[in-house]
Design a protein with these regions (language model features):
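N-terminal helical cap/lid subdomain that shapes the substrate entry/recognition surface
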Residues: 1-60, 66-71, 81
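Short acidic-hydrophobic, aromatic-tinged amphipathic segments that line or gate anion-handling sites
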Residues: 169-173
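Generic C-terminal helix-cap and adjacent flexible tail
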Residues: 28, 175-186
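Structural signature of beta-strand start/N-cap positions in the alpha/beta core
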Residues: 68-71, 128, 148, 168
């Protein structure tokens, strides 16, 4: 077993990587990862929102972005079904242009493919995109996609980790995102 805080560093690169990191070194085989995954997914499909909720202020920020005709997409390393379910549950009033989770055959973040897919779908240029995330994986993803990066310091990883990846901006609270983008708060 691991200390709960250790899991903050196990997550972020998809569930297979989570299992690999959590397993003892001598047990880190593809067969073991797949076995755990087969047991985990049915459980997580039922319990993925347990002890989970949007960060303070995020719903208001999303509503403000939407009210200002800003297109919003999601690129996550959670598997696709879980990503879609969580977004629909927590943000039913937000019109996302695309919600992409981890999918078979598509590289996980920090590979930029999911971000680039969303950009292509809505035909926006890199200069018009801000990628927001709370980890080094997110900052790498945004940089790999060639877009503006905004680090959210209230997430799973410490502010110092975000700073090490030199995002264009670090938001210490949700409303800071609007200020950086030049959008007035409602």
């Amino acid at each position: 077993t691991h200390d709960t805080d250790a899991y903050r560093y196990f997550v972020g690169n998809g569930i297979n990587k989570l299992f690999e990191r959590a397993l003892p070194e001598t047990e880190r085989t593809e067969a073991n990862v797949l076995k755990i995954r087969s047991q985990f997914i049915p459980y997580y499909n039922i319990h993925n929102a347990d002890l989970s909720r949007p960060y303070p202020g995020i719903e208001q920020v999303l509503h403000t972005l939407q009210a200002n005709q800003i297109l919003i997409g999601v690129a996550s390393n959670k598997y696709q079904a879980a990503t879609s379910k969580l977004i629909a549950q927590y943000f039913p009033d937000i019109q996302f242009v695309e919600v992409l989770g981890q999918r078979e055959g598509v590289p996980a973040k920090p590979d930029p493919q999911a971000v680039l897919e969303i950009m292509e779908k809505v035909d926006v240029s890199r200069e018009d995109v801000a990628y927001i995330g709370d980890s080094c994986v997110d900052m790498e993803t945004g940089k790999n996609a060639g877009v503006t990066t905004i680090g959210a310091s209230w997430g799973f990883r410490p502010r110092t980790e975000l700073e090490a990846y030199t995002p264009d901006f670090i938001a210490d609270e949700a409303c800071d995102i609007l200020r950086f983008l030049g959008i007035p708060e409602e």
